[in-house]
Amino acid sequence: MPSEGSQQPSLDSFFKRKNPRVEPYSRTGNNAIIDLTDSPPNKKIKLDDEGSQKNRSMTQTSSSYFKGHPTARPLSVDKRLPRKPSAAIQAYKLQDVIPPQPSHSGLAFETCSLVPQASFVPDSQPEPSASPAPQRTTEQLKRHEEWKTRILAMSGSFRRKRSLALDEAVAAEAREAAGLEDEGTPFDGSDGDDYKSESEKNAEEVGKQLKKYVAKELAGKGKSKGKKKEEIGPSGLAYTPLEKQFMEIKEQNRDVLLLMEVGYKYKFHGEDAKTASRELGIVAFPNRNFFTASIPTHRLHIHVKKLLSLGYKVGVITQTETAALKKIGDNRNAPFARKLTHLFTAATYVEDPSLSSSSSSSSSVRFDDPVVPGTAPPPTNALVAIVEQPVDRASDDRVKVGLVCVVPGTGDITWDEFDDSQIRTELETRLAHLSPAELLLPKQRLTKATEKVLTYFAGEPKHRGRNAVRIERIDNIPEYDAAFDFLTNFYHCKEHKATVSKGDVNDERHLMTEGNKQWSLQPKLSQDGADISLDEEIYLASGVSSSKAILTLVDFPKQVVISMAVAIRYMKRFGLENAFKHTSSFVRFANRSHMLLSSNTLANLEIYQNQTDGGLYGSLIWLLDHCKTRMGKRLLREWVGRPLLDVAALKARADAIEEIMENNSYHMEKLRSLLINMPDLVRGLTRVQYGKATPNELATLLITLVRLASEFKPNMGNVFRSCLLNNIPNTLPTILDTSQRFLNALNLKQARENDVANLWADPDRFPDIQDVKDCISVCEMELNEHLMELRKILKKPTLRYITVSGIEYLVEVPIRDTKIVPAQWMKISATRTVNRYHTPKILAITKERTQHLEKLSIVAREAFIAFQSEVAEYHELVVVSKQIAVIDCLMSLAQTAAASGYCKPKFVAEPELKILAGRHPMVEMLREESYVPFDIHFSKEEGTTKIITGPNMAGKSSTVRAMALIVCMAQIGSFVPAASVTLSVHDSVQTRMGASDEIGRGKSTFMVELSETSDILQTITPRSLVVLDELGRGTSTYDGIAIAYATLSHIAEIGCNTLFVTHYPTVAQDLAREKPDKISNWHMSFDEIQMPDGGAEITFLYQLTRGLQEASFGVWCARLAGLPKPILDTAQMRSSSLKAETQERLRGIVARRVGWMLHNLFDNKTSSSQVLRNVEMLHNSLSSSSISFSQ
């Protein structure tokens, strides 16, 4: 046996790390109880005083302080203790610790640890007098006392910890540390044989239980022995059934972040857990073979939305059986059945209420949060599918792009095909308008230029305050023929496939326009031969039939057909393909009825977001948006970004706004009241179209539609002057009967509780539901009859079934009456006072009833989906909802127009733009100071090009932005901030302002400047409005002047209305002199006061005035910016010096020019008229150079 001193430190360190907690061993009377309640076997060993010695020799303990059996052989130190105690139970195999004994049948096991008692000393040790204890040194005694205090002098109550089955040497070391080394034993072992058989029996029973428990706790090597290699996880442990479920679903959804419902939590596993921990800020920890992270069920929808906003695809795995049903089912020992029931991306998430526990049945359903006027329009969450084809096979510079955009939440679909240049400006413009949340792109990649634009756009939200844009790569993009066949099958028009050709259906009416290479949908023939168009289809009451849908396919360009097939195939995975059902929702992006604002114009004019932080505050949509409904906010955003080109439509909107402002009649007030507490009807009806609405949602929709339809009586006639306003009272009554009929079909009380099984007011509407209910009623009747029998058996006339923890039809019997309970009854649960049972008959009937309940759930859900499909067929409900949104937008614009100083614009046929007392709409609202108005007039008589010069910070950029915004607002149909505005319809507003680089796209500041200018020159027409701010400043002075001069000269020849801001006076002077009928000079006025120190103090007047102004007063702006005075003084001196040098050079040039003129005059080589022209040119040069003849 190792010496005490050598072994004490190792034992001390071992127990210090493990920190065992041991229950004290106690004796009462003649019996001793070893309590194993905390261990899985839940056994208690009863020991009497006579047989305790032999029993202890068998139940050798790991932390016992008694000496073991005299025949126990000691183990070596290396085998006795693990070198790394953290290896826990896995390092110890009990059969190696306790040697097999002949009388013990080779049994090896472990028992609980016992705190030593003074009266128990093994008889194998000699008496103290015969064998004195070895003498200890002072250091050993001190260490001994500390150890004894640590073991015995604590609270006295040590909870039992799993034994590690230490060998006899360690046990002896523990006894010695406890001071029991020299104690003897009162047992002589004479009666051991009489107790031996019972002791062995108890020991074997306990040993078997403990071996089973220890085997369960052993790590991979022991547990996984005999398992197939694929069943063993990375930790060496076999995969659990739950882990196998996750792996099976993950194998089919590798690109999805999965949440698995486990009890009252949703869990992430593996790499998904690490991702969730990083993005959601939750803890991920290793658990068997995977990392695990979890969230509570009531927070699921919050975390799902956050993950979607970060660009992830999220799947939700739910339990398809309840705990109560599982307990009485045949698979009670198997894991819960689970499957992937929800799959979302940012674009396809349509606010599924089944994920939100916050939507109670008693609360009124709102499909969006309450609308706050002035807040941002709801995100469209658009999905955009893009394909392309190079125009020239030899080069990828120019491509033909096909684009389909679908908004799953509203069902709106936008499509387009267009040719794009090398820098993909057209594509960028469409992305800026559509603002997609997700892009569907071919996996084999697009052209390099296109990929660069898409990558930049997807990464831009980090800097523009938007959510991340997700990119989904699609395999196997179909060819045109395959895509056409796919769409044909989708619209169920197989009967037309043989008769409708892909290229010869009314070719003369569906030809490609050769001029702009764009397809347009012209009127086409329906089956009855009548002409129809997409605009007319929008107002068809019954929606668009599948036969008409297939006829529209031949009108779509080839790239659009391919994009649409890709989008529909992708949407099918989410169950949202019905968004393409109604072709009346199809709109072409670029058409002749709307102005196309480029992405640069949207940014420079701050249409959707400000340029300061990318937020809503200070933008045009912020100024105009006073909508009361979500659908109104979405429509207004579309209006603002796509101004009208149709004068009749513009006048209709302006007239409606004017009447709203002036009319306070009863009917107008009723029209305003329609918008109060209005849910998002468009989004709600779209969810009905998908079959994803809840009964509560559907009831809310129908109640709202009935309320709207009841506000106006049929055949009221025109109660308003405006045709737009009259659409509501004329259309609303037409949906009353339909809405009321659908509403009457529902049991409202059950609908509010989302009770699908009892939803229908007429039980015979869906007979399958009633048949299943009848079967359930038979089962319940049999259970009631069986209850009568149970009352007789138990002699309890008042006996009733009870339900506990979701388990129904329990028979509760007091403990005192359990003797009369038949042996066939199954005990389900118990308390201290009662037992609860299921009889065999109850088990059989409830199993049958459970099957009927599951069938009822399926049948009722199918019936509700069929009812939603029936509602969705009535497309006029969506049309009326969109008209409500139109009224909301008009009311919002009227509220803006009510501000002082706004006027109704006047449209004229001839090209003209005349603004009197115009103001910047947003600056006027943001600043407390009054805005200084401006006057401007563009016409053939007044010229179409205005060059604006003047000092920095004088208001040049603000003024030109205000002019462009007034044009945009006028063509939205809104009133404008001016005293008077007369204008013709502009087909585009093009702007080139500011200076910034695009490093991500490989463009310098000057390259960006020239690229934007190039796009403008390629798209403008004589009816465009162009704003160019300081073109040419990104390069050297000479190159900048040359580019500015050439560009402005070219634009002036086109004849479009142009505002050109520059600090190059030479350009302004030369062009105004060369083209006086088209170009005129203007500047922002100021006052200059000379100071005693030789400097000047500048006061900006912010007034637009005719004439040229050379001075920029850059040093004065530097003074306003707070630059140090020494720098300002140096800059002023250098500026004066450079100005003097320039004037000196000009004097030399003038002197040489005068000498040349006089020489030619006296030599009679120049005519008098030529001399006069030369003198005039010289005078102009002197004037522009601030050099007088006297100088």
From Swiss-Prot:
Assembly: Heterodimer consisting of MSH2-MSH3 (MutS beta). Forms a ternary complex with MutL alpha (MLH1-PMS1).
Function per UniProt: Component of the post-replicative DNA mismatch repair system (MMR). Heterodimerizes with MSH2 to form MutS beta, which binds to DNA mismatches thereby initiating DNA repair. MSH3 provides substrate-binding and substrate specificity to the complex. When bound, the MutS beta heterodimer bends the DNA helix and shields approximately 20 base pairs. Acts mainly to repair insertion-deletion loops (IDLs) from 2 to 13 nucleotides in size, but can also repair base-base and single insertion-deletion mismatches that occur during replication.
Gene for this chain: MSH3
Gene Ontology CC terms: nucleus
Residue ranges, annotated region (Mispair-binding domain): 233-347
Protein name, as recorded: DNA mismatch repair protein MSH3
Claim: Nucleus is one of the keywords in the record: yes
Biased composition, class Basic and acidic residues, residue ranges: 139-148, 193-203
InterPro entries: DNA_mismatch_repair_MutS-lik_N (IPR007695), DNA_mismatch_repair_MutS_C (IPR000432), DNA_mismatch_repair_MutS_clamp (IPR007861), DNA_mismatch_repair_MutS_core (IPR007696), DNA_mismatch_repair_MutS_N (IPR016151), DNA_mismatch_repair_MutS_sf (IPR036187), DNA_mmatch_repair_MutS_con_dom (IPR007860), MutS (IPR045076)
GO BP: mismatch repair; mitotic recombination
UniProt subcellular location: Nucleus
Protein family (similarity comment): Belongs to the DNA mismatch repair MutS family. MSH3 subfamily.
A GO molecular function held by the record: mismatched DNA binding
Region (Disordered) residue spans: 1-82, 118-148, 175-203
Superkingdom of source: Eukaryota
Keyword entries, A-Z: ATP-binding, DNA damage, DNA repair, DNA-binding, Nucleotide-binding, Nucleus
Sequence ranges of Polar residues compositional bias: 1-11, 54-65
Skewed-composition ranges (Low complexity): 122-135
Annotated ATP binding sites: 950-957
